[in-house]
């Protein structure tokens, strides 16, 4: 979220809290009646059924939008127009399919706030023909999904079920992603907008809402338009994306992306030495293998950073050359650890050049996707956030 972070810093915002990552503070939980639960469930299911998966690309100037992403934006826009009809609030859908809402202040001297969620879903799992399955009054046992998959509270994947006994649990049918990241956030914000505008007694400053696109490919900030949110200068920004209910994260991973391309000449293996064969597949695999297992995401706990080589893709080339592209994520809380991870990647690149001299390595510049909000958030704000949540 590089540009958004820049906008936030330039505007001198008080804070940005990401509800997504390990460092959390806890606000008071609330109980809701069956009517509210049913309404929220229906809204979420309707959103989850829309396949709004993004499409990742190494072209950092591109901003791909799939038909489902456009459909999701139009659905949220239509729901909000119905909710806000007859009020002073405004709804705007931009050319980039972001949806913006402004609820004007009805009292003076109250800080402004902006809430955010994203409309897209990760492209890294099957996402077509999503079938949400609603499990009401969960009894604490195994969930048997239509695909044959069993979700058990005794497994790492189902460990959160232990806190859901007696509640409504929603899953996919087991053959696709559900898309709760971030259809949950979208559902929460649309419901919040409904609550605010129906509560005539609530006194508030300007309240803004942003439903962004392509967050899951690290580009939510690329088409963010500050003109729709008071010039980009609300006093507090809260992103609804990920963590457990009532948890507010006040620190998060800094996210950096980079792409490495391995290029070499094609040749028959029997004539590889004389022809200076550049085996790009093996070179790319060698590069990935240079990253210490201790720095793999599966070894990361809490605030430990990691390097994730998450795709390896052949690329069409000409002039008798072949190419393989490896996309890499770096995640870290501490800036010094980030420097250590960069050194590891640089060493891995150098080792490929030594081991496979016929392969050319081309690395794109780093792309800062979003930054740890703790770098710029005043510590005094944590209790303010809790107080606001209550």
Regions found by a protein language model. Give the residues of each.
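Phosphate/diphosphate-binding glycine-rich loops and adjacent basic-rich segments that engage nucleotide
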Residues: 239-267, 272, 281-282
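C-terminal segment of classical bacterial N-terminal signal peptides
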Residues: 18-26
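Acidic/His- and Gly-rich active-site-bordering loop/insert found
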Residues: 28-168
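Bacterial N-terminal signal peptides that target proteins for export
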Residues: 2-12
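A generic structural motif
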Residues: 176, 266-269, 273, 330-338
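Metal-dependent amide/peptide-bond hydrolase catalytic core
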Residues: 279-390
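Acidic/histidine-rich catalytic neighborhood of metal-dependent amide-processing enzymes
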Residues: 161-253, 299-318, 326-333
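Buried hydrophobic packing segments
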Residues: 76, 80, 188-196, 284-288
């Amino acid at each position: 979220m590089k540009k958004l972070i820049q906008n936030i810093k330039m505007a001198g915002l008080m804070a940005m809290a990401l509800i997504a990552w390990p460092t959390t503070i806890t606000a008071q939980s609330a109980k809701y009646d069956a009517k509210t639960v049913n309404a929220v469930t229906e809204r979420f299911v309707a959103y989850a059924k829309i396949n709004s998966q993004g499409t990742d690309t190494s072209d950092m100037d591109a901003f791909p939008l799939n038909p489902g992403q456009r459909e999701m934006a139009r659905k949220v826009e239509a729901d909000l127009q119905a909710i806000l009809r007859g009020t002073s609030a405004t709804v705007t859908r931009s050319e980039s399919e972001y949806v913006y809402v402004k609820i004007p202040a009805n009292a003076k001297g109250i800080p402004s706030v902006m809430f955010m969620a994203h409309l897209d879903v990760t492209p890294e799992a099957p996402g077509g023909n999503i079938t949400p399955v609603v499990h009401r009054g969960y009894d604490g046992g195994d969930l048997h999904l239509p695909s044959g998959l069993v979700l058990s509270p005794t497994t790492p994947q189902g460990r959160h079920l232990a806190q859901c006994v007696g509640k409504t649990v929603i899953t996919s049918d087991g053959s696709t992603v559900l898309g709760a990241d971030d259809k949950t956030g979208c559902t929460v914000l649309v419901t919040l907008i409904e609550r605010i505008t129906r509560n005539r007694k609530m006194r508030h400053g300007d309240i803004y809402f942003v439903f962004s696109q392509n967050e899951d490919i690290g580009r939510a900030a690329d088409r963010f338009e500050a003109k729709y949110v008071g010039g980009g200068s609300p006093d507090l920004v809260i992103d609804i994306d990920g963590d457990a209910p009532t948890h507010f994260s006040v620190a998060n991973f800094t996210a950096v992306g980079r792409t490495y391309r391995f290029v070499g000449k094609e040749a028959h293996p029997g004539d590889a030495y004389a022809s200076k064969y550049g085996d790009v597949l093996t070179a790319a695999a060698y590069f990935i293998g240079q990253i210490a297992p201790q720095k793999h995401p599966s070894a990361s706990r809490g605030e430990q950073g990691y390097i994730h080589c998450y795709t390896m893709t052949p690329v069409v080339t000409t002039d008798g050359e072949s190419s393989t592209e490896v996309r890499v994520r770096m995640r870290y809380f501490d800036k010094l650890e980030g420097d250590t991870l960069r050194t590891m990647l640089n060493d891995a690149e150098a080792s490929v050049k030594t081991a496979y001299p016929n392969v050319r390595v081309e690395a794109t510049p780093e792309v800062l996707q979003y930054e740890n909000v703790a770098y710029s958030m005043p510590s005094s704000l944590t209790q303010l956030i809790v107080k606001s949540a209550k």
